[in-house]
Amino acid sequence: MRLTVKQVTWLKVCLHLAGLLPFLWLVWAINHGGLGADPVKDIQHFTGRTALKFLLATLLITPLARYAKQPLLIRTRRLLGLWCFAWATLHLTSYALLELGVNNLALLGKELITRPYLTLGIISWVILLALAFTSTQAMQRKLGKHWQQLHNFVYLVAILAPIHYLWSVKIISPQPLIYAGLAVLLLALRYKKLLSFFNRLRKQVHNKLSL
């Protein structure tokens, strides 16, 4: 049985709760000693992992809708992507304000040079920013065929974000490996589209360098 519009609407409500409840828990944990010995790192890792979960969920929607024959499920993809961006922004903000401090934001440029995993994180966030800004139907109509080309950059985020996570942890544990494995699996499900995206990107870079 296929999902109805009403059921998808309720599903969106549940997904909004899934995006909001972790934030409420984090606020509670901060105020009630629910974090570990290094609360700053805990906040950074929690926000980053939550962003990664929503990224993976976003990538899951298309193959799930196709194989389950639930076309209306696609309507939840934008919502999940926006929650991914929201949590990625919280992740970046927690690093900038809690790790560096308001008075040391000028050090961010130096940090990006000395810690390459931060560069991967910033690149991922900038891409997510562009995708969030252009996620509306109005922007889709305005950009035309270029809209899909832009939004295919989510595949690059799906590669960079797990590497950023793996690189940032001092001790490799199963958790970042699981996230990386899930990202590889979700990318493998659309390998033809992935190859087409990177071939087009390679040609564009080559053309720019040839000018």
UniProtKB/Swiss-Prot annotation:
Binds 1 FMN per subunit. GO terms for molecular function: electron transfer activity; FMN binding; heme binding; metal ion binding; oxidoreductase activity, acting on diphenols and related substances as donors. The chain crosses the membrane at residues 10-30, 82-102, 116-136, 153-173, 178-198. InterPro entries: Fe3_Rdtase_TM_dom, MsrQ-like. It comes from the Bacteria. Keywords: Cell inner membrane, Cell membrane, Electron transport, Flavoprotein, FMN, Heme, Iron, Membrane, Metal-binding, Transmembrane, Transmembrane helix, Transport. One of its GO terms (cellular component) is plasma membrane. Pfam families: Ferric_reduct (PF01794). It is a multi-pass membrane protein. Its cofactor is FMN; heme b. GO terms for biological process: protein repair. Heterodimer of a catalytic subunit (MsrP) and a heme-binding subunit (MsrQ). Belongs to the MsrQ family. Part of the MsrPQ system that repairs oxidized periplasmic proteins containing methionine sulfoxide residues (Met-O), using respiratory chain electrons. Thus protects these proteins from oxidative-stress damage caused by reactive species of oxygen and chlorine generated by the host defense mechanisms. MsrPQ is essential for the maintenance of envelope integrity under bleach stress, rescuing a wide series of structurally unrelated periplasmic proteins from methionine oxidation, including the primary periplasmic chaperone SurA and the lipoprotein Pal. This is Protein-methionine-sulfoxide reductase heme-binding subunit MsrQ. It comes from Escherichia coli O81 (strain ED1a). The lineage of its organism: Bacteria, Pseudomonadati, Pseudomonadota, Gammaproteobacteria, Enterobacterales.
